[in-house]
């Protein structure tokens, strides 16, 4: 036991300074990218915590209306595209306006989007076959749903940690006359 304690003290003692250069290196060791196993673990870790407290890891849809969406507490008016940590206005009016060009944003991104959830309004509409074919050729799955279900699916996939995108068209609002007409029938 005494010898083990003696060896431990031996390694902690400072060598006699042979010159000022050796003494300076002993007080201020250089920390390079190649650390020896004897170095403290504190110097081997890299942490970035500033951005984690300011920005969420993923974009979540809080609510939707006929005017647009509430995404992470921010209101977005009109159709929009949701990407990991980004929201972009989308220049489409209805599902008929969705073209290969309007989806080109999804295959230009790195890391590659795994699945795109498309919300087409109040009901599920069919997209042009060429658009779906273009997405399949680039290895991106497409899920077409009505907007309320597309919002829920997008949130679920983001919660799972998948690299997900969404292209959402707000459902059209009901006018007071239309809702009164349905109520009287």
UniProtKB/Swiss-Prot annotation:
<dbReference type="InterPro" id="IPR034095">
    <property type="entry name" value="NDUF3"/>
</dbReference>
<keyword id="KW-0472">Membrane</keyword>
<keyword id="KW-0539">Nucleus</keyword>
<comment type="similarity">
    <text>Belongs to the NDUFAF3 family.</text>
</comment>
<dbReference type="InterPro" id="IPR007523">
    <property type="entry name" value="NDUFAF3/AAMDC"/>
</dbReference>
<dbReference type="InterPro" id="IPR036748">
    <property type="entry name" value="MTH938-like_sf"/>
</dbReference>
<keyword id="KW-0496">Mitochondrion</keyword>
<dbReference type="GO" id="GO:0032981">
    <property type="term" value="P:mitochondrial respiratory chain complex I assembly"/>
</dbReference>
<dbReference type="GO" id="GO:0005739">
    <property type="term" value="C:mitochondrion"/>
</dbReference>
<protein>
    <recommendedName>
        <fullName>NADH dehydrogenase [ubiquinone] 1 alpha subcomplex assembly factor 3</fullName>
    </recommendedName>
</protein>
<dbReference type="GO" id="GO:0005634">
    <property type="term" value="C:nucleus"/>
</dbReference>
<comment type="subunit">
    <text>Interacts with NDUFAF4, NDUFS2 and NDUFS3.</text>
</comment>
<comment type="function">
    <text>Essential factor for the assembly of mitochondrial NADH:ubiquinone oxidoreductase complex (complex I).</text>
</comment>
<dbReference type="GO" id="GO:0005743">
    <property type="term" value="C:mitochondrial inner membrane"/>
</dbReference>
<keyword id="KW-0999">Mitochondrion inner membrane</keyword>
<dbReference type="Pfam" id="PF04430">
    <property type="entry name" value="DUF498"/>
</dbReference>
């Amino acid at each position: 036991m005494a010898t083990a304690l003696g060896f431990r003290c031996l390694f902690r003692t400072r060598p006699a300074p042979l010159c000022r250069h050796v003494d300076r290196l002993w007080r201020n060791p250089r920390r390079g990218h190649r650390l020896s196993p004897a170095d403290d673990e504190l110097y081997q870790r890299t942490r970035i915590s500033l951005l984690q407290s300011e920005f969420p890891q993923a974009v979540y849809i809080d609510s939707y209306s006929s005017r647009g969406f509430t995404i992470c507490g921010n209101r977005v008016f009109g159709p929009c595209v949701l990407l990991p940590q980004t929201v972009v206005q989308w220049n489409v009016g209805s599902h008929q306006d969705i073209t290969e060009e309007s989806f080109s944003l999804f295959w230009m991104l790195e890391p590659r989007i795994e699945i795109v959830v498309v919300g087409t309004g109040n009901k599920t509409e069919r997209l042009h076959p060429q658009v779906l074919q273009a997405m399949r050729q680039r290895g991106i799955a497409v899920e077409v749903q009505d907007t309320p279900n597309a919002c829920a699916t997008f949130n679920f996939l983001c919660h799972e940690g998948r690299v997900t995108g969404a292209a959402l068209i707000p459902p059209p609002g009901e006018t007071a006359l239309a809702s009164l007409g349905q109520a009287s029938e």
